[in-house]
Amino acid sequence: MAVARSVGERVGRVSILVNNAGINRRNAFTGDAAAVIKDWEDIISINLNGVFNVTHAFLEPLRATKGRIVNIASIQSFVHVRTPNSPAYTTSKHGVLGFTRALAAELGKFGVRVNAIGPGLIETPLNAAVRANSPELVKIFIDHTPLGRAGKPEDIVGPAIFLASDLSAYVTGSIVMADGGYRAI
């Protein structure tokens, strides 16, 4: 609550929360047990528990403003996209999807809408190493994407604005895919 209070003092009433934090590590699941467990705990802690913790911290201001929560999920909330060694990331993003839907059901009675965006391959620092070191994986992904390209961070802006605005006043518990059509085929 102290964080929410501090933010409220700086920016005024909080009515929109975007949970956009995530990490991934590509260590082999079959590798060193201690490293695998550490990676699992770190990824789940940031990607899933972080969404829970921040949302919980801002719950009262969001209820007071009948606010909107936009969680950043992933294409991997739905499918495994042939990226190696990603069970923790995939699991964390499945969790964000489940959390989004469950929270939408629970907070709807307070007028709070909870939705998510499911980005496909977006050119961000999170996947820079994969893009640089595994062009064959990027090609497989892009070849499966009807728009034929990776997304840019600005490709997420439109869905985020829509979900945070009154244009989506009757939308809750939904996932807006921003994946270039990856899931369409």
Identify what each model region corresponds to.
Residues 12, 108, 113, 171-173:
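Short, small/polar-rich loop/turn modules that mediate ligand/substrate recognition or access, typified
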Residues 24, 160-161, 172-185:
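Short C-terminal tail/terminal secondary-structure segment
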Residues 26, 30, 83-85, 109, ...:
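A glycine/serine/threonine-rich, flexible loop-to-helix segment
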Residues 28-44, 141:
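Substrate-binding pocket helix/loop in short-chain dehydrogenase/reductase
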Residues 55-56, 101:
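A short, exposed helix-loop element centered on a Lys and neighboring polar residues
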Residues 60, 105-109, 169:
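Alpha-helical segment proximal to the catalytic Tyr-Lys
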Residues 70-95, 100-109, 122:
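Catalytic loop of short-chain dehydrogenase/reductase
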